[in-house]
Structures are given as C-alpha cells and as structure tokens.
C-alpha cells in the first residue's frame, strides 16, 4: 500500500491521541501556557532530582514552600537559612546546595579573601556535619585595578586555600556562572560580574585541578551570555556539579513566554550520566505561585 504524507500525519495524530488517552496527560512542554498548566501535577518519573532555590518564592514562608515541594515531589531545597534545615529534614527533603559568601564580594579581589575563606570554610563544616554535599562560590565583581589574568589567579589562590578541607570532607565547591547582560532587575542579571563567561569559569576550574571544585551550570545565565546550551552541557559534563533553571528572557516561568526547550535540556543532562540536583530558580510571575512551581516541575520531569 502506498503511504502518503496525509496518511503519515493521520497516524501520528492518532498515536498522540492514544498516548494522551491512556496516560491521562499530555507530555510536558516548556511552551505550555499558564492556562494549560496542570493544577494537580505531581512528579512521576523522578529521573531528574528536582530542587528549589528558596529566595525566588519570597515572600512565601520557607516551611510553606517546603511543604509544597514535598507535595509536588521535589526532593530538596537550597538558598534558605540554615535555621530551617532541621525542619526541612523532618519533611524528608535534602539541602542540595549550601550558601557561603555573596556574589558581589568574591575572590577576584584579594581584599575579600579572608572573608571568602572564612565563610566557605564554615559552610564546608556545616555540610560535613549535616551530611550535605555542595557549597556555592562566586568570582565576585570586577575591580578596575585588576586585569583579567590577575583576577583569575586571585580566584585560584583563594579557592586553593579551602579546597584541601573540601577534599578531606568530600564536599564539592560549586562555582556559579552569572550573566552580566540583563540590567533590568538586580537578580535577573549582574553587570560587572567577573565570571560571566561560562568558558572562562571552566578554564579556572581546570586550572585549579581539584575534583572538589565544579561548575554550577545555570541554564538561564548560560543562555543569556553564551547560548548553545546543550552542546556546552555535553562539552563540560565532567566539570558540572549542579544545575539551575529559569525561563529566558525574564528569569520567569518555564512557559510559552520564553525560549529554552527545557525538556530537551533535561534529556541532554540525563544522557551525560549526571545524577545530582537540578534546582528551579525562576522568579514566578503567575498569580498562582504553586501552579507555577507545579508547571516547572512537570516540564523538567522527563
């Protein structure tokens, strides 16, 4: 029997309908609009270990957010005060990343080294005592008197002061790359941030040469600054220690207002063998914040 284009399209449509009929839901897409989001979604596949960056859902109380995460099926939280860690653990959630120094005052400037070393050391000890595995670090902002090569050397010098302890305690220090292009909001972009080129961040990590220093690959920031996200995930898979998400442009929901194909990105991450956490770090704009988180969780539950 001769098969034409119309027959093929009809067969594909029938297959899609049958899939929806028997699974009860359509496959999640990054371009699903708010009015099509599933208000009852719970994570089913769980191949991506999803977490949430707590500050993005302010002013929602931390424990209210934690209970929502548990109900949806997220398995961890980060970016919250350590005073909540015991309650988070009682809910059965992990802490996927522990804070240290801020992104503005980083090791680019030697004047910040003592403070960075102190805060990173405290966070490593906290992780080791509580059974957590990752601590965040940043480069800090550029300084006019410091050229790029000197800035790189300064960062390396500072990190090498704390990495022996991290290695001993089996803790991973995660360097976050941030975009410097978006100046529309203080947390959507960070003009002046030194580590704004993901390739440069990887160069610094490789020059340090420690398995306890990895890249925090923020998909949103990489898309803004460098693009070619999936190729870079594959290229840098051996140095990636953590992931963040958000829609671009706007650092908002993973919906039809943004350009990143998150199901494709999540599948690419899985194909690299990565088994760590992917933290949702979008700033919700929908009136229903819980629905926004459910939607993002569904998009990433590939």
Regions found by a protein language model. Give the residues of each.
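Short, conserved active-site loops that position catalytic residues or coordinate cofactors/metal ions
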Residues: 91-103, 138-139
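Conserved beta-strand positions in the central sheet of alpha/beta enzyme cores
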Residues: 78, 97-99, 136, 174, ...
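Active-site acidic/histidine proton-transfer and metal-coordination neighborhood
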Residues: 12-22, 42-44, 106-214, 224
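Catalytic domains of carbohydrate-active enzymes, especially glycoside hydrolases
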Residues: 65-84
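Histidine-acidic metal/acid-base catalytic patches
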Residues: 2-24, 29-70, 132-133, 146, ...
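Active-site-adjacent beta->alpha loops and helix N-cap segments on the catalytic face
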Residues: 85-89
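Short, acidic/turn-prone active-site loops that include or flank metal/cofactor-
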Residues: 56, 99-106, 247-248
């Amino acid at each position: 029997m001769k098969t034409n284009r119309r027959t093929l399209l009809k067969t594909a449509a029938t297959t899609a309908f049958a899939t929806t009929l028997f699974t009860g839901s359509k496959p999640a897409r990054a371009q699903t609009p708010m009015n099509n989001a599933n208000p009852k979604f719970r994570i089913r596949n769980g191949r991506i270990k999803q977490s949430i960056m707590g500050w993005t859902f302010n002013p929602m109380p931390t424990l209210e957010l934690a209970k929502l995460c548990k109900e949806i099926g997220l398995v961890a939280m980060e970016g919250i005060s350590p005073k909540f860690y015991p309650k988070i653990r009682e809910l059965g959630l992990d802490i996927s990343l522990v804070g240290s120094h801020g992104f503005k005052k980083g090791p680019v400037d030697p004047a910040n080294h003592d403070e960075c070393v102190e805060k990173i050391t405290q966070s490593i000890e906290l992780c080791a005592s509580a059974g957590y595995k990752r601590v965040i670090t940043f480069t800090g902002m550029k300084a006019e008197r410091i050229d790029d090569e000197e800035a790189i050397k300064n960062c390396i010098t500072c990190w090498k002061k704390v990495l022996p302890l991290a290695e001993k305690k089996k803790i991973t220090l995660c360097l976050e790359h941030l975009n410097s292009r978006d100046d529309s909001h203080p947390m959507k972009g960070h003009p002046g941030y030194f580590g704004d080129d993901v390739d440069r961040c990887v160069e610094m990590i490789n020059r340090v040469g420690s398995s306890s220093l990895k890249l925090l690959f923020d998909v949103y920031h990489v898309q803004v600054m460098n693009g070619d996200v999936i190729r870079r995930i594959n290229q840098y898979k051996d140095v990636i220690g953590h992931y963040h998400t958000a829609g671009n442009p706007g650092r908002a929901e993973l919906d039809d207002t943004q350009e990143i194909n998150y199901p494709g990105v999540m599948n690419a991450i899985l194909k690299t063998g990565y088994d760590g956490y992917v933290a949702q770090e979008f700033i919700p704009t929908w009136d229903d914040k819980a629905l926004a988180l459910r939607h993002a969780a569904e998009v990433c539950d590939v």
